[in-house]
């Protein structure tokens, strides 16, 4: 598992604040960048990396809207199988957040144990249960902390308008997306 979070000055990212107005955004749209991490850097477990890692990327226009869960595509599995539940997203989501920010819950409310897989540039999330799927309704629970690459959450844009304490308290609730497991694999 490879994960590195690069934090850029929020003042350079948010529109209309001092650092952004004076210096502009830290990355330029259309430019290609290469992130390189050399051997010897300490990983999350306190061990030095053995080899160099690189990831190339091109900067696109910032997404300045909440994550639209209603635009996700849910492909439910077939009952009595261990086929994966598959979610596809219209844009990439935060890789680290996808591992912990989405769980699957049975119709009875218990978390279903299984393995998560993430691919297609963080635009597909797959969950393979440890035991066969039971027919019926289940739900996908989405953490309010899940972010896309621009820092947007299911509750709002990273640089959205000021929100009241009441609005912020609503943002701590977990969103749920129901899905049905039937006898034959189908789309919802």
Identify the meaning behind each predicted range.
Residues 1-188:
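Acidic, low-complexity Ser/Thr/Gly/Pro-rich repeat segments typical of extracellular/periplasmic
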């Amino acid at each position: 598992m490879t994960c590195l979070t690069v934090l850029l000055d929020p003042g350079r990212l948010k529109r209309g604040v001092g650092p952004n107005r004076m210096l502009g955004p830290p990355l330029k749209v259309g430019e290609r960048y290469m992130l390189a991490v050399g051997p010897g850097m300490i990983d999350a477990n306190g061990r030095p990396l053995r080899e160099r890692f690189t990831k190339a990327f091109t900067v696109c226009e910032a997404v300045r809207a909440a994550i639209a869960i209603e635009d996700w595509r849910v492909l439910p599995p077939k009952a009595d199988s261990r086929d994966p539940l598959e979610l596809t997203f219209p844009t990439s989501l935060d890789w680290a957040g996808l591992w912990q920010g989405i769980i699957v819950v049975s119709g009875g409310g218990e978390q279903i144990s299984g393995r998560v897989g993430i691919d297609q540039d963080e635009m597909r999330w797959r969950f393979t249960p440890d035991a066969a799927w039971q027919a019926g309704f289940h739900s996908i629970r989405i953490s309010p902390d899940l972010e896309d690459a621009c820092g947007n959450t299911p509750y709002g844009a990273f640089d959205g308008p000021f929100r009241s304490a009441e609005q912020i308290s609503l943002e701590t609730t977990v969103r749920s997306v129901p899905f049905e497991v039937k006898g034959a694999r189908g789309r919802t």
